[in-house]
């Protein structure tokens, strides 16, 4: 099914720019019918195309990889230069003990499979939240929630370990203690250059801390990515609001690949993966099931908007300090 959102013609993002392409199952793509002619223009079709994948991870790592690989191959077939996977793309366990048992180091078999997949497809990958056994695994028996960027040759070019852990008690959603099995990362990662633009790395709960996004944009980020696994209570209330807020305040594209559906008897996720442009408009989104959506990234539009609305020139650190001080 197509979902239509009326939005400025210079930022229309959809598959309609690629005549003859088959729309993937479960995708929802944003394009008002009256702008289809414009969407097929050569200048629009030359913009970088990104794919945002939505999955329902379970404790079955092999099946999870098969699902993700199918979506990545579809993204490559459709002409994307970069595919985004959600937090916990590798698995979602039933308890901390199962999390520890299923986790791997970055040098393990699973990332080697993704290395081969990136080479096969010629695609950059944002692997949004890998359960990593770090160098301190033997001492701590805890993992890092690690966001991995892999280039189209299969090389890991950036890693970010989630710095804000989700230890919360939400009525109707149940308690969550990420710190039971996870260590917070020690630092932020400088934005990484990709074919789609300079990407600032974050994960899920990080989006609730605007200082992080401000630090990333002041360090040069053009795209902020929040791979996530939002729950069924916080999702409807906060998901889109937070993503649009981060896009507006930083004047960045925001890409948010999400987990969806029921993972096992103890957990379900909200879904609704999306891309938000620097104006704050949702330009692509997935429906509730597994699938992908596509968006084009227009960095000229981003720069134009930053010139027209120069909020970073108007900041007053003399009054409130430099929130989100640039990364060193």
Swiss-Prot record:
Sorted UniProt keywords: Cytoplasm, Hydrolase, Mitochondrion, Transit peptide
Active site: 87 (proton acceptor), 162 (proton donor), 204 (nucleophile)
CDD domains reported in the protein's UniProt record: nit
Record's protein name: Deaminated glutathione amidase
SUPFAM superfamilies: Carbon-nitrogen hydrolase
InterPro entries registered for this protein in UniProt: C-N_Hydrolase (IPR003010), C-N_Hydrolase_sf (IPR036526), Nit1/2_C-N_Hydrolase (IPR045254), UPF0012_CS (IPR001110)
Transit peptide (residue range): 1-37
Function, in words: Catalyzes the hydrolysis of the amide bond in N-(4-oxoglutarate)-L-cysteinylglycine (deaminated glutathione), a metabolite repair reaction to dispose of the harmful deaminated glutathione. Plays a role in cell growth and apoptosis. Has tumor suppressor properties that enhances the apoptotic responsiveness in cancer cells. It is also a negative regulator of primary T-cells.
Locations listed in the record: Cytoplasm; Mitochondrion
EC number from the UniProt entry: 3.5.1.128
Gene transcribed to yield this protein: NIT1
Pfam family, one: CN_hydrolase
Record domain CN hydrolase: where: 47-299
Family: Belongs to the carbon-nitrogen hydrolase superfamily. NIT1/NIT2 family.
Organism of derivation: Bos taurus
Major place of residence: cytoplasm
GO molecular function, one term: deaminated glutathione amidase activity
Reactions performed catalytically: N-(4-oxoglutaryl)-L-cysteinylglycine + H2O = L-cysteinylglycine + 2-oxoglutarate
A GO cellular component annotation in the UniProt record: mitochondrion
Matching PROSITE patterns: CN_HYDROLASE, UPF0012
């Amino acid at each position: 099914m197509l979902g239509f959102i009326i939005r400025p013609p210079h930022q229309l993002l959809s598959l309609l720019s690629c005549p003859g392409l088959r729309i993937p199952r479960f995708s929802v793509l944003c394009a008002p019918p009256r702008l289809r002619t414009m969407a097929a223009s050569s200048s629009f079709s030359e913009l970088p195309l990104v794919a945002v994948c939505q999955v329902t991870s379970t404790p079955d790592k092999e099946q999870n990889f098969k699902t993700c690989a199918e979506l990545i191959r579809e993204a490559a077939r459709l002409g994307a230069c970069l595919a985004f996977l959600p937090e916990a793309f590798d698995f979602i366990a039933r308890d901390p003990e199962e999390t520890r048992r299923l986790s791997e180091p970055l040098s393990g078999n699973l990332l080697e499979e993704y290395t081969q997949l990136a080479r096969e497809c010629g695609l950059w990958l944002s692997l949004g939240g890998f359960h990593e056994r770090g160098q301190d695994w033997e001492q701590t028996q805890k993992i890092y929630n690690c966001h991995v960027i892999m280039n189209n040759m299969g090389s890991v070019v950036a890693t970010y370990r989630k710095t804000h852990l989700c230890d919360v008690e939400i009525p109707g959603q149940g308690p969550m203690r990420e710190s039971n099995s996870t260590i917070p990362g020690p630092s932020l990662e400088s934005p990484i250059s990709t074919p789609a633009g300079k990407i600032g790395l974050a994960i899920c709960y990080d989006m609730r801390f605007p200082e992080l996004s401000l630090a990333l944009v002041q360090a040069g980020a053009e795209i902020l990515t929040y791979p996530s696994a939002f729950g069924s209570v916080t999702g409807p209330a906060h998901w889109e609001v937070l993503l649009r807020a981060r896009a507006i305040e930083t004047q960045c594209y925001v890409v948010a690949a999400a987990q969806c559906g029921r993972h096992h008897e103890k957990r379900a996720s909200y879904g609704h993966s999306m891309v938000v442009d620097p104006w704050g408009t949702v330009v692509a989104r997935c429906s509730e099931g597994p699938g992908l959506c596509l968006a084009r990234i227009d960095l000229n539009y981003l720069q134009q908007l930053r010139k027209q609305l120069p909020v970073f020139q108007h900041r007053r650190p003399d009054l409130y300090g430099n929130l989100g001080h640039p990364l060193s």
